[in-house]
Amino acid sequence: MALALTEMGSRLEQRSRMALEEDTREQISFCSAHTDNYEDPMLVISESRLRDNARRFKAAMPRVRPHFAVKANPHGDVLRIFKEEGLCFEVASIAEIDAMIKLDVNIETVFYSNPIKSPASVRRATEAGI
């Protein structure tokens, strides 16, 4: 039975990798067709990939409440998508605290875990209810 489950898991992982590779190829093709006038580097973010990754993470660990580190990508749309997918957030600066307020997240679920906190940032976090 264990071997059958391992083989099934391997096939699912292989299909998942193939779908991911196809999605990546489509994104590269799309970007290539739309970036002829750009010379500077750019970051392209897939909303569907963000949503899928958030859902997969939550499904894999249903008892865990994931907290996205805002410093990893503070773009408002990324934060909005993760909020809509039910993720919580971890902040490390006044700007990130303010982003949470602007996004109207449940402040009680926000972690403020910067190991080096200025008095001003501690005051701001306290004022925000973190």
Segments (PLM) and residue ranges:
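A charged N-terminal "starter" segment
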Residues: 1-130
